[in-house]
Amino acid sequence: MHRVSRALVVASVLAGVALGSPSVHAQAKGAPVNSSFAPVPAPILQGKKAFISFELGDVSSFPSTYSGGPERAYNEFYQGMQQWGRYQLVADPKDADVIFAIRFVDSPGLSHPQIRLGIMDPHGAIALWGFAEEINAAVRKKNRDASFSATITQVVSDVQQLLATGGGPAQP
């Protein structure tokens, strides 16, 4: 009996230490685990003109799961970037300082569909950065559509935050 009590005390102390540790609290609050930042590539920070590329992703989810067509992610991302106004959006990748390639992904191996954004250097087709955001599941189509749009908004916000933390201006 004394052994069981001692084991409970030790377990309680260890649990208290683990729960009281700042890293556990930071993770529980959604704070980033990696607090150090690598430099953001110069074309992203210094670029003035951007081309938005539509990468054809998985089309089987349209129109049954989500409204619109396969180009929905492109259209909503383009609109979000245009409203932000940080980059002048150009129609030809040759005129761009940076390329944003947007794609909807709904592969069988994923637990949730994703919106993926690749940021590339147009001169060397080198990947500079990328984001992947999951689309929250919903039962009703109107809620799935709202979740889709919220995910696109989050991707635009990801780009804004990247520029803000990378030393570049968040606004022109």
What is each residue range found by the language model?
Residues A28, Q82-Q88, P93-A146:
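Surface-exposed short loop/turn segments
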Residues Q46-A101:
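N-terminal segment of the mature soluble domain
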Residues A28-P32, E55-R72, L110-S111, S147-Q154:
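Glycine- and small hydrophobic-rich membrane-insertion segments that are intrinsically disordered
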Residues A15-H25:
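C-terminal segment of classical bacterial N-terminal signal peptides
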Residues A11, A18, A42-I44, M81, ...:
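A generic structural signal for short, solvent-exposed coil/turn residues
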Residues M1-S12:
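Bacterial N-terminal signal peptides that target proteins for export
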Residues A26-A50, F77, P122-P172:
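C-terminal/domain-edge helix-coil "capping" segments
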